[in-house]
Amino acid sequence: PIGQIASKIGRKRTIQCGIILLAVCFASGYVLTTTFSSINAIMFVVFALVGLAWAAINVNSLPMVVEMCKGSDLGKFTGYYYTASMAAQVVTPIVAGTLMRKIDYRVLFPYAALFVALSFVTMLFVHHGDAKAEAKKGLEAFEEMDD
């Protein structure tokens, strides 16, 4: 489903929508964890939406990288992509864990929201990587004329 959405509105816009949804979910998580003393049932919905948002981001990221590079550079840019994402997965548990130990576990949602907001800013600078629509041939070209 996410791939179909991306083919209609574009990968970049799909990723940006995923980032916005992720930020809203993290803000909701912060509000819910500071408002209620136990896990509220709505948190399950919030975390399901987090999964949807993450899918919108993750499913489209590598294809954007692949679309932006020439065939001879594919391995190099795929390596950059995975190095950046794995480095974040190494660093953030250390930083977030330290913050949670020094401050409180509730700092996790604002921490996540901050970096999600920064990722939105970086996506504003992306100008390439959307799939190019294939030109229709033969009778397929006339299908849209019936609408």
What is the meaning of each model-derived region?
Residues P1-R11, M100:
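Helix-to-loop junctions at the C-terminal end of transmembrane segments
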Residues K8-I20:
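Cytoplasmic membrane-interface "Motif A"-like loop-to-helix N-cap segments
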Residues L21-S37:
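C-terminal ends and interior cores of transmembrane alpha-helices
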Residues N40-A56:
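Hydrophobic core of transmembrane alpha-helices in multi-pass small-molecule transporters
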Residues A56-C69:
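Intracellular juxtamembrane helix-capping segments at the cytosolic ends
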Residues H128-D147:
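Intrinsic disorder in cytosolic terminal tails and internal cytosolic loops
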